[in-house]
Amino acid sequence: MATTSVSSPKSKPSWVSFLSGGLAGVTAKSAVAPLERVKILYQIKSELYSLNSVYGSMLKIVENEGIKGLWRGNSATILRVFPYAAVQFLSYETIKNHLVADKSSSFQIFLAGSAAGGIAVCATYPLDLLRARLAIEIHKKPTKPHHLLKSTFTKDGVKGIYRGIQPTLIGILPYGGISFSTFEFLKRIAPLNEIDENGQISGTYKLIAGGIAGGVAQTVAYPFDVVRRRVQTHGFGDAKAVVNLEHGTLRTIAHILKEEGILALYKGLSINYVKVIPTASIAFYTYEYLSNFFNKL
């Protein structure tokens, strides 16, 4: 295994990290948008989930809404993901380059990734709320994103457009930290046959490393994602699962465990693996490819 043969990249200009991150996020999320919509629909309902029903759910969406229905809410996703991923990767690179003393320390990289995820969530959360609510409208004409955001703000104010941010932040801290630190660790131990004469790791290895990083991080953070979606969509559209908005994140998790069992906290996880692994692979690979490309301009 190689631990010192990988070339150490120079610090990227801020605009490179920002633009590369945004484009990487949009590319990855758009590719798996149909799976994301089906996952959200399962998370917010109390019925049992089966991976075998994914295909049937997609067919039902196509039957009711047409093929475009599989991408309903993706416009809001793109509006959110570009700034989210841009801010996340920019924050990560900035923190790593200026505050992380030991670039080979997985713990310090974990902290940088966690902080970057938290910053990105706070900056773009209303758009994430918007995406979730658009995704669960399955029996009526789609609401215009800006109309939905305006009506939510008018009805509930700032608190309304940030509903569910607590479990989101609690979940993104381990997710961001684990995904970045795992990806960087896997790059450091890349086999010699995956490294070229210039010290560059192969694209195939980066795709695999990104997928592993996303899968590991998602397993740890997923229960918070379920809570987030339930809080975000409570009383809206086809959301049926019971949730008490007065409860904090941990009390909500305890309530779900009591009423529905531990499997409810992992509802949709199997489809999420199918979604997250290619998403993380594409995002990390595209980011590194584009940042290297832009650095040469």
UniProtKB/Swiss-Prot annotation:
The keyword Transport applies. The keyword Transmembrane applies. GO terms for molecular function: coenzyme A transmembrane transporter activity. It is found in: Mitochondrion inner membrane. InterPro entries: GDC-like, Mit_carrier, Mitochondrial_sb/sol_carrier, Mt_carrier_dom_sf. Solcar repeats lie at residues 12-98, 104-189, 201-293. Its main location: mitochondrion. It comes from the Eukaryota. The chain crosses the membrane at residues 15-35, 66-86, 107-127, 165-185, 207-227, 262-282. Signal peptide: none annotated. One of its GO terms (biological process) is mitochondrial coenzyme A transmembrane transport. Keywords: Membrane, Mitochondrion, Mitochondrion inner membrane, Repeat, Transmembrane, Transmembrane helix, Transport. It is a multi-pass membrane protein. Mitochondrial solute carriers shuttle metabolites, nucleotides, and cofactors through the mitochondrial inner membrane. Required for the accumulation of coenzyme A in the mitochondrial matrix. Belongs to the mitochondrial carrier (TC 2.A.29) family. This is Mitochondrial substrate carrier family protein P. It comes from Dictyostelium discoideum (Social amoeba). The lineage of its organism: Eukaryota, Amoebozoa, Evosea, Eumycetozoa, Dictyostelia.
